[in-house]
């Protein structure tokens, strides 16, 4: 029910593992081809125990359930740090408890199970791993993995009988009846010849049947001590002594990043761009100090040596922070992940210098594929992870980390290389990965509700104004099918040369790779398709045959929207004429956008190809052209694409006349007019046009300085981030929270200093005047605000306007006048080029539908996608990226990075530590795979909701498989519960009881349940292991 996890009985666990393996060649969603096989001959030793890999899951969400531990092992984790236990084992935690959007915050502590249940989960996993290892990776040298116990939080609690029983049973379970029970269960399974034959294990029969007797009764020889933030030094030392002296356990003690002191921690976070993370200085006052730690560690190392045991430190604990995000409950939350790395690695350097590299370090602070090689090469081991495994790719990131380590020459190091660690600690403060800007702030999202079925979607496509087939054309490029890729692009994009240069690429802000490393350079790939595919595409292209039955179309305006409309309609056989008042086509792209942003020949390329489709151009047309005139000339459809060619300007006091409006200025600049602007130019506004004006002004002879003045802050600035960065690169200066009031003849520009108030209707904080002013000495002023339609001209043209003076149009851009459409910026104000093309597509789609032309998009099926191939990419992070200058290497790299999310998404499956979301192939749906939620496995941590691109929560909104009647009754999720020959079903808060036969077939299914019952039948027939028993 909800956040109550239900453990899987051991026998059922084995059934789940091997039935899924037989059915799907996967275990807990990990495909067989991605089971990690350690490199032979490379091992590490941790206090005398051998480990085939130095990596594994940290004590946390990935080691709470048996299936989590199994999944960690399958993907390369061999040092398994079990989730922390404590005497208070019946705490109720508020949910959600994890926020892993970037750096991770959590509000969870120890295991959510009782001590007995936690021990039982670890025991199940202990047996399961021995079996899996014997089946898939047999070895004569014994087990390849280490279980490490994690306990907390004070000595009094640890000495309580339940904790003593837990620790003792972890150290030796020989007298516990569960150990004998599970050994008998395993023995029975391995004596079953049918089981061995089904999985091709007959040749291993002898060794497998001897396995149960060989499984050690001691699960752990080591412990990691976890103490609360603020635990007194004497208490920490006392617990360590107890573990060494009384329990005889090799011991790691977990220390806090607060050892660096408040000032240093604050400095590091601020330098790396994480200044918004709130800290309480008094928390540092209560924590262990460095001098105290050094003295304590020296005493404990001596004690361990005396007892012939191992002792070291676990670095580091999470960092206690103020809960100022509002995503999690409570006043405090605990930070981990990449923001923790520079802190933890600097703690490691401080301690290693003090102990000359002889202090063993178990590491966990911000380890990832981008840092693990550097950490390992210093001699630090083992290395455990939690935050990185909560990101898309999930457990597969462990495998990726191991592949990074396979080539290391540091496997034989038996101490910490202090010099190397010092260099890493210094580098950690400046490396890209630890800087906040490394991950853009944009959230990958689809602005629609999460559907019950068919939820696989490529967010790059949904973000695109023309819904370009991005994953498909990237795959074609990767296969060197450049002309095919370009043909696919042309299906939806009339202007690939233009949009290959100046598209606002919303696709890249919604690329799933942002949750891994960086977005694909999609716009550059479009450019490559045109460069490499054009010649072949043009050879096989045929001019569309015009049809005498098609109605003629007039388009007023030959800018991007007009060109696109002409292309789409002419391609479908319509006679199209574009009427343009200028002497050329291209509109704002040709005449306003500076040519340093896009070469003129590329603009002409798109114009020429539109003309090649038979589109006619009439230049120098009267601005007084009306809809009625065009209708009288025989045009059935009229599309208006006149753009936004008016500037409202800025009202200023003063008598300086050296004031330009942005559009006239850029038009004159593009003509090559000899402009006299003086030395210092100020541009008012902070949109893309303002960036163009400032960059253009700097290229005018005599101009030495260009300053953009904006009345809001950087965060509210409407310009695309890319345009802002280009302006900075060119040397443009910025003055935020300044608003011009007066421009005097002597060049004095008076600016009112502003502050930010409450958000406006667009979510931007309103600028509020202060009593302060500043002055600048300025030669010319350019106003780049208030671009809008010429509503007077529209009214004269005969366009109906609404009460606010905007064109009154429907979703397709059609006005109240039948067959008259508004497209491009004139429809709703200035936007991007691709958005203008998008409005043209919607209008032309409506026209073609009205003309009974089914579609102007080819139905050719471009990709026979192999999901296994895509899944291979899921755990990988690109350590280095090649430059786009090397076209072949760049295309190969980006094609390999594309996750093709509309074919294989399953992010909610990846990121769930408990494996509570599953993807199964179900025939008869649009998507090959459907996502189900397993109620029994879920604790509602909220992580799947964080990374799902839809507006929704998979653990609440997807079809839920219930295992217990009480959980079904206490939930509102859509889902089902199979009870022998009947199924209880819930959808939209309505419930049904249906009969199901032994073959999984229903009778009399209500129409609204067709999809759900098809899935239920498929699960019943092919994935019955998902319906297995659970413990109450």
UniProtKB/Swiss-Prot annotation:
Cofactor annotation remark: Binds 1 [4Fe-4S] cluster.
Domain 4Fe-4S ferredoxin-type per the UniProt entry, residue ranges: 928-958
Family annotation (InterPro entries): 4Fe4S_Fe-S-bd, 4Fe4S_Fe_S_CS, DPD_II, FAD/NAD-bd_sf, FAD/NAD-binding_dom, Helical_ferredxn, Se_rdtase_YgfK
Binding site for [4Fe-4S] cluster: 938, 941, 944, 948
Signal peptide: none
Cofactor: [4Fe-4S] cluster
Keyword hit for Iron: yes
A GO molecular-function descriptor: oxidoreductase activity
Gene ablation phenotype (knockout): Insertion mutant is unable to reduce selenate to selenium.
Record's keyword terms, sorted: 4Fe-4S, Iron, Iron-sulfur, Metal-binding
Physiological role: Could be an iron-sulfur flavoprotein with NADPH:O(2) oxidoreductase activity.
Protein name: Putative oxidoreductase YgfK
Species the sequence originates in: Escherichia coli (strain K12)
Gene that encodes it: ygfK
């Amino acid at each position: 029910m909800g956040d109550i996890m239900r453990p899987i009985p051991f026998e059922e666990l084995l059934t789940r593992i091997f039935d899924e393996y037989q059915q799907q060649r996967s275990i807990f969603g990990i495909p067989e081809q991605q089971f990690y096989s350690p490199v032979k001959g490379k091992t590490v030793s941790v206090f005398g125990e051998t480990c085939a890999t130095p990596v594994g899951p940290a004590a946390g969400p990935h080691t709470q359930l048996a299936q989590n531990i199994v999944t960690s092992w399958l993907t390369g984790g061999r040092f398994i740090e079990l989730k922390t236990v404590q005497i208070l084992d019946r705490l109720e935690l508020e949910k959600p408890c994890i926020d892993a959007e970037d750096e991770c915050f959590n509000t969870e502590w120890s295991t959510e199970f009782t001590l007995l249940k936690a021990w039982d989960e670890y025991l199940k996993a202990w047996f399961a791993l021995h079996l899996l290892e014997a089946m898939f990776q047999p070895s004569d040298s014994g087990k390849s993995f280490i279980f490490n116990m994690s306990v907390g939080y004070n000595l009094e609690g640890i000495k309580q009988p339940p904790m003593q029983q837990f620790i003792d049973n972890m150290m030796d379970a020989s007298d516990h009846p569960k150990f004998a029970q599970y050994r008998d269960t395993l023995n029975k399974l391995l004596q079953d010849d049918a089981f061995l034959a089904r999985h091709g294990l007959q040749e291993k029969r002898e060794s497998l049947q001897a396995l149960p007797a060989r499984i050690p009764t001691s699960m752990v020889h080591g412990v990691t001590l976890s103490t609360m933030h603020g635990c007194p030094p004497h208490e920490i030392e006392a617990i360590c002594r107890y573990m060494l002296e009384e329990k005889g356990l090799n011991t790691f003690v977990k220390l806090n990043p607060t050892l660096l002191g408040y000032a240093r921690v604050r400095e590091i976070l601020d330098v790396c761009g994480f200044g918004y993370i709130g800290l309480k200085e008094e928390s540092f006052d209560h924590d262990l100090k460095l001098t105290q730690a050094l003295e304590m560690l020296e005493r404990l190392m001596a004690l361990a040596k005396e007892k012939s045991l191992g002792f070291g430190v676990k670095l580091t604990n999470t960092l206690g922070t103020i809960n100022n995000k509002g995503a999690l409950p409570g006043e405090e939350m605990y930070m981990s992940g990449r923001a923790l790395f520079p802190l933890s690695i600097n703690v490691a350097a401080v301690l290693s210098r003090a102990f000359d590299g002889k202090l063993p370090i178990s590491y966990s602070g911000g380890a990832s594929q981008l840092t693990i090689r550097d950490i390992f090469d210093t001699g630090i081991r083992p290395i455990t992870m939690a935050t990185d495994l909560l990101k898309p790719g999930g457990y597969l990131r462990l495998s990726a980390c191991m592949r990074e380590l396979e080539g290391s020459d540091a496997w034989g190091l038996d101490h910490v290389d202090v010099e190397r660690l010092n260099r890493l600690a210094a580098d950690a403060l400046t490396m890209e990965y630890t800087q906040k800007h490394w991950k853009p702030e944009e959230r990958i999202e689809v602005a629609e509700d999460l559907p019950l079925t068919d939820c696989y979607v490529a967010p790059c496509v949904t973000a695109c104004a023309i819904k370009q087939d991005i994953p498909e054309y990237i795959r074609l490029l990767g296969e060197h099918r450049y002309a095919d890729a370009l043909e696919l692009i042309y299906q939806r994009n009339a202007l690939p040369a233009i949009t290959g240069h100046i598209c606002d690429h919303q696709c890249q802000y919604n690329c799933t790779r942002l949750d891994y490393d960086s977005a694909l350079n999609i716009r550059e790939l479009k450019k490559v398709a045109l460069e490499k595919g054009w010649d072949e595409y043009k050879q096989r292209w045929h001019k569309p045959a015009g049809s005498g039955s098609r109605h003629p179309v007039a388009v007023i305006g030959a800018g991007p929207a007009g060109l696109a409309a002409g292309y789409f309609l002419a391609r479908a056989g319509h006679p199209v004429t574009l009427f343009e008042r200028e002497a050329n086509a291209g509109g704002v792209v040709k005449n306003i956008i500076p040519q340093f942003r896009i070469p003129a020949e590329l603009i002409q390329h798109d114009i020429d190809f539109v003309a090649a489709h038979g589109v006619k151009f009439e230049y120098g047309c009267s601005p007084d052209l009306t809809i009625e005139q065009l209708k009288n000339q025989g045009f059935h459809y009229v599309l208006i694409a006149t753009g936004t060619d008016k500037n409202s300007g800025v009202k200023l006091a003063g008598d300086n006349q050296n004031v330009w409006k942005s559009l006239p200025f850029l038009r004159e600049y593009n003509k090559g007019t000899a402009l006299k602007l003086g030395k210092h130019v100020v541009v008012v506004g902070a949109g893309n046009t303002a960036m163009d004006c400032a960059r253009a002004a700097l290229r005018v002879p005599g101009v030495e300085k260009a300053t953009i003045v904006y009345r809001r802050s950087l965060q509210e600035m409407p310009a695309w981030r890319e345009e802002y960065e280009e302006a900075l690169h060119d040397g443009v200066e910025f003055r935020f929270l300044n608003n011009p009031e007066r421009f005097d003849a002597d060049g004095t520009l008076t600016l009112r200093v502003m502050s930010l108030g409450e958000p406006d209707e667009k979510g931007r904080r309103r600028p509020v005047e202060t009593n302060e002013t500043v002055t600048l000495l300025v030669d010319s002023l350019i106003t780049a605000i208030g671009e809008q339609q010429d509503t007077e001209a529209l009214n004269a043209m005969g366009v109906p306007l609404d009460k606010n003076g905007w064109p009154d149009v429907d979703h397709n851009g059609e006005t109240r006048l039948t067959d008259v459409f508004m497209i491009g910026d004139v429809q709703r104000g200035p936007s991007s080029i691709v958005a203008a093309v998008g409005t043209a597509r919607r209008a032309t789609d409506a026209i073609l539908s009205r003309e009974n032309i089914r579609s102007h998009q080819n139905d050719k099926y471009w990709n026979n996608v192999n999901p296994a191939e895509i899944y291979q990419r899921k755990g990988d992070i690109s350590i280095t990226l090649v430059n786009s200058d090397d076209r072949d290497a760049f295309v190969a790299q980006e094609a390999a990075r594309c996750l093709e999310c509309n074919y294989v998404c399953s992010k909610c499956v990846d990121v769930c530590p408990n494996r509570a979301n599953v993807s199964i192939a179900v025939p008869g749906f649009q998507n090959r795979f459907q996502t189900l939620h397993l109620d029994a496995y879920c604790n509602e941590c909220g992580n799947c909701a964080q990374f799902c691109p839809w507006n929704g929560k998979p653990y609440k909104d997807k079809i839920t498989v219930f295992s217990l009647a009480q959980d079904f009754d206490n939930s509102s999720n859509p889902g089902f519960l199979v009870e022998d020959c009947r199924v209880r079903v819930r959808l939209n808060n309505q419930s049904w009881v249906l009969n199901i036969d032994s073959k999984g077939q229903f009778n009399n299914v209500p129409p609204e349940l067709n999809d759900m019952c098809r899935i239920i039948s498929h699960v019943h027939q092919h994935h019955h292991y998902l319906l297995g028993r659970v413990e109450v």
